Amino acid sequence: MLKKLVFTLFCSFLSFCCFSQKTENDWTIKKNESGIAVYTRTAANSSLKELKAVFYVKTSLSSIIALIDDRENYSQWVYKCGKSTILKKISETQEVHYQTTIVPWPLDNRDFVITTSLSQDETTKIITIKSSESPNFIPNVKGFVRIQLLEASWVLTPLKDGIVEIEYRLLVNPSGAIPAWMANLVVTEGPLNTMINFKQWVMKPKYQAAKVSFIKEVD
């Protein structure tokens, strides 16, 4: 009985190790343009593709947060964003956000509702922003297919000389019938174009001058 228990525990540990190795190392680079590297991998226990974009910007943490928090202007720089608005401000660091995505005819446009939370490590000053779907927060909107699965995160890591490493991850099921070419846009072209625009927009005077009260900069 004891031998069987030990064997079972060992198998469980081995499975966990293999799973951890996959989730940390199984990325494939898809794009590397304008200083932005875009990777994908198959999500655990799913056929969906998870995306990771990594790039570097010389700017303050406040400027980045000011841009990310400026939801009303997402249509100006987020790829194919039609509308973006805050539905509920829970606190300085938590909110519920609604956004639409415009897709080519004859496909139906998509929309989603997400709850977003921000935290900052007191020692390293690393900022983590996590978003997950809240599809039932408001009723479905006519003309849009509501996305039921969306998980996203930003990790902002301050480095030397004012450089910030930005890592963005996205796992999304666009819902409904999606052709392969659109799926490719979702996981590669769309995020790449968004991050190219991000690097330009964060340098605008409006964001460069921003001082976000709850964000601590590196000394």
Q: Where are each of the predicted segments found?
A:
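Sequence-pattern detector for short linear motifs
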Residues: 6-7, 44
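Positively charged n-region of N-terminal signal peptides that target proteins for export
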Residues: 1-5
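Bacterial N-terminal signal peptides
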Residues: 8-15
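Eukaryotic helix-grip
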Residues: 21-219
